[in-house]
Amino acid sequence: MSARMNTSRPLWPWLAGLALAVTAFAHDRARTPVRIPDIPGYRTLKCDFHIHTVFSDGKVWPDVRAEEAWREGLDAIAITDHIEYQPHKADLPTAHNRSWEIAHAHGEGLQLVVIRGSEITRAMPPGHLNAIFLTDARALDVPDWRAAVAEAQRQGAFIFWNHPGWTGQQPDGLSRWYSEHTELVASNQLHGIEVVNGREYYPEAHAWCLEKNLAMLSNSDIHSPLNLDYDLHAGDHRPITLVFARDGSPDAIKEALFARRTAVYSGTLLIGREEFLQPIFERSVRVLTPHVQVRGTGRAYVQLHNESDLPYTLHPATGDADLQFPRELRLPAGRTALLEVKGRAEDRQGERTIRLACTVTNLLVRPREPLHTELEFKVTLLPK
């Protein structure tokens, strides 16, 4: 018995080590990048400019918002607690700058840009407006909404209209343009509109952004912990604004917003001006087999690799006298798909350069109008 006891090892150090390893794993901090390509001349930054904390009606401490965003692969966020709506003031003092100060300090350690903002929370019209790149949110706490907006403008803020079709202010869910919004645009006090808020898409707002040259925004308006609203492990994600900026600095983001260089990424939809969506698609999709052979009425397959996190749904042109193509092709995110090329006749021969016209149905350049693009490859036709 004593010999066995001398050769055995105590169990507790091993158990303690296991416990430490499990604890370390449970608290592992890791970032998942959002794979959407840069476009010529600009970086594609992933941003959320509408976020709440416990300092208004949110349920999360501000530093958690920075941590969530960094882990989800975002480059910048804005903390935009309500100015007028303070339901937690019995537990927390009203301190309009404090949530940004806490989140900003945490974001600095993660190299995440955290922008100071506020939500000017008024009845419709004009509704709720976000002002970001503020220098002092306290100055917006005034009775008159026009005075609040004028103060935001004086501070150099970028101002946008939140959730224009929100049923809390528009019970039928339809976005409506009021004379107050015309007034704001005319005085350079409205620079963008949320085309997407949470899981809601507002086609009227999409059209207004194009008509009135306003920036398109897509934001979460998150109140709860992120993983309660979005099933991240199943591939779900918050809506984000893509900002095409010269670099990742706050100044570059602000310049890009005022220049309207933005797009909307929500679910599997990408919404924006063609000048931005076209290069994103072209830089996402790579033709792996740019030259195929088709013998007679046989088939060949062009391999298309999608390097982005965006799935694409293509509707190719049906073909011509020599070749035919499928009516629909799905390009899953991060995977390679096969485009079938089928011959129509037994006796065709020669080499052709194909510029296959396609619509990308989940990339919208206008409401209900998909992006039109081309896929280029070569086909050698051989007689059977």
Predicted regions and their residues:
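Bacterial N-terminal signal peptides that target proteins for export
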Residues: 2-15
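Compositionally biased, intrinsically disordered low-complexity segments enriched
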Residues: 6, 52-54, 178
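Residues in intrinsically disordered, low-complexity segments of regulatory proteins
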Residues: 11-13, 160, 176
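Bacterial N-terminal signal peptides
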Residues: 13-23
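Charged catalytic cores and adjacent phosphate/nucleic-acid-binding surfaces used
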Residues: 15, 27-48, 66, 124-134, ...
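A metal-dependent hydrolase metal-coordination microenvironment
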Residues: 30-158, 162, 170-171, 188, ...
